[in-house]
Amino acid sequence: MSLSEEQVRSFLDGNPTFAHQYFGKKLSPENVAGACEDGWLADCGSLRELCQVEESAALFELVQDMQESVNMERVVFKILRRLCTILHADRCSLFMYRQRNGIAELATRLFSVQPDSLLEDCLVPPDSEIVFPLDIGIVGHVAQTKKMINVQDVAECPHFSSFADELTDYVTKNILSTPIMNGKDVVAVIMAVNKLDGPCFTSEDEDVFTKYLNFATLNLKIYHLSYLHNCETRRGQVLLWSANKVFEELTDIERQFHKAFYTVRAYLNCERYSVGLLDMTKEKEFFDVWPVLMGEAQPYSGPRTPDGREIVFYKVIDYILHGKEDIKVIPTPPADHWALASGLPTYVAESGFICNIMNASADEMFNFQEGPLDDSGWVIKNVLSMPIVNKKEEIVGVATFYNRKDGKPFDDQDEVLMESLTQFLGWSVLNTDTYDKMNKLENRKDIAQDMVLYHVRCDKDEIQEILPTRDRLGKEPADCEEDELGKILKEELPGPTKFDIYEFHFSDLECTELELVKCGIQMYYELGVVRKFQIPQEVLVRFLFSVSKAYRRITYHNWRHGFNVAQTMFTLLMTGKLKSYYTDLEAFAMVTAGLCHDIDHRGTNNLYQMKSQNPLAKLHGSSILERHHLEFGKFLLAEESLNIYQNLNRRQHEHVIHLMDIAIIATDLALYFKKRTMFQKIVDESKNYEDKKSWVEYLSLETTRKEIVMAMMMTACDLSAITKPWEVQSKVALLVAAEFWEQGDLERTVLDQQPIPMMDRNKAAELPKLQVGFIDFVCTFVYKEFSRFHEEILPMFDRLQNNRKEWKALADEYEAKVKALEEEKKKEEDRVAAKKVGTEVCNGGPAPKSSTCCIL
């Protein structure tokens, strides 16, 4: 049946799409040229040029759109619409590549684009996306293989999925699809569906497809790189600001998390987020366990963290960013609280997994509230939840983010950003844990110091042994005037002559420990510092008594040794005339340093502290015990009731503490050999001054030289037992040796090491020889130089020489005995050998050979 011209015209007017497609195909330059007469070739060529101009204009328009528009969807939409026309495809679609929970997928961004479509109709909103995992559908296969695919008949393609057709009531016949790549990474997949003017897409269509997709690829690359740049910028800002708040708040994990999360809220790109903090208790208290053991309560059967803790959220912090910003803190949240009711935070705390949920209301595993949470009408759409893990790989909390601001589900870049934040905050827990440990250690230290002070400090009854104010005045020392205390002390103290505290030959052997305390108090009065520096007399008594108690009850380095060193310092200053170089304040500090120089000594040396890995060795790098003695002395002086420096001004106090630092550290014999040459130069320098007064004036102003002399004085005081009269020195030497042998026993039993001869009890007989070596190698230089420096100190050097003679005589006597024993031993060995030979001859054994004859 033929159609009239009017009917054809009417049909074409009523079907513009068909007309456009039909004439677009029939009126190509080639077809028109073939239908034209020869005379029209020039005009037909002009028609071809006109089509090329139109094509160039279209390409120019695309380039212009790419340059002017930052909207990726708009540019790609125009490209797809143009492709539909050129390829004669029924429709085109754009699928964006993304990852969630570590699984790649493709989601529709532009769907069913036709030549006359509008962007608004084709742009897929986030809640209407069609999502293809990479193992489903042809687009998934394209993303996996990263190659263009031309499917001529989908019925014969094993990768085809009718999932989208069923959703849209559409029938797909053939497909041309290609990936958009950024290097080796897939960015998107573009697909053309159903060839209109043929059974399938041809190779020419593939070429055209590729040509136009160069523009799409460029645009999508720019979009992808821009998105990655934006994500990295946000990530950098998140880490920067969270670090700022983490290091600003080191004391409390809750405050640290809150400050960090609140500060970075603008960079998280979500409408709301909550942080659930987990109880870190691993073991229950006994009173919580008893009801379970008694059958009165059911044992916990709920989920646990990977390290075995019960999952208990003790606090939830809810950050609301949509509408009016708000923060809600929920201590001890109930199980049905909206942030916990879904079960997602509990699951994350149990498994440690990152969970990215695209459609919360349709999720079958977790029970999210479908309706609005509050009066604002806010609804949960998509969720990203992840654990906050500390450096010990313990889950300390769970952070959950709701509803990405642009409506799209959270992608892999969001996961990376949020994970960076939670990971950083998890590691920063180490700061608060360390602070908490330090705080506890500080508290324990304070408690330990208080306990030590309780046992060391002179109590109210002990002070009455020196200051009997109850018997004399009927009241406590604190209630007495200074003059009253001074009168009592004047009567109770022994005076300077009773125990010869001004003499180098002073011996403590005839004194009780309490008498030594009284002698120590007397030395301060003799120095004239009590009145000058306004030392409270009760404080002075308490200080000396407490120092005596702070020395341990060990063999040698006890209170008696501490007092002897202070007395020798006092004698060097007063009798040895070294006080002329020092002020009263400096003499005050030097005697105090002598009293404290070995306080709390353990009876073992520095080397043993290191070998036994004593905490002191870890606390102090060098001069281990000396630094401990110094710290202990300062600790006592820090107590107001013992602080004899309490009335010094700031500059005076700093000066005496500085001198104590030098004086006590100088008792380390390892430092003695470093300062010997410097001290000798000072002594030699003093001999260049004929006028002693000029030398005193010079040295008094030379701070460094005075400190070197003081340091050498401390060494002379520490070794002064070697300069006592022989009857005293011989006894003290045995005490020193006994303490050394005790350390040797510890090295042998505890450290399983062989001690050096000086500390070996089995070589006790070699003590005289060791003493001679010690005098020659260490002691002689000190006292020889001091006797050159001040002739008043010569008695110390003379007694040292005398003691050396005594030890040398004992050493020679021991050597003679050893030699005699060796000779006797050799004779005995010779007798045994001769007897053995005679026995062999009598028994018919071989006779000795003669050098002059031979017996046949």
Swiss-Prot record:
Name of the protein in its database record: Rod cGMP-specific 3',5'-cyclic phosphodiesterase subunit beta
List localization entries. Answer: Membrane; Cell projection, Cilium, Photoreceptor outer segment
Which residues belong to any copy of the PDEase domain? 481-814
Could you tell me the gene encoding this protein?
Answer: Pde6b
- What family name appears in the similarity comment? Belongs to the cyclic nucleotide phosphodiesterase family.
Q: Which domain of life is it from?
A: Eukaryota
Q: Where is the lipid attached (S-geranylgeranyl cysteine)?
A: 853
Which organism does this record belong to? Mus musculus
What function does the entry list? Rod-specific cGMP phosphodiesterase that catalyzes the hydrolysis of 3',5'-cyclic GMP. Necessary for the formation of a functional phosphodiesterase holoenzyme. Involved in retinal circadian rhythm photoentrainment via modulation of UVA and orange light-induced phase-shift of the retina clock. May participate in processes of transmission and amplification of the visual signal.
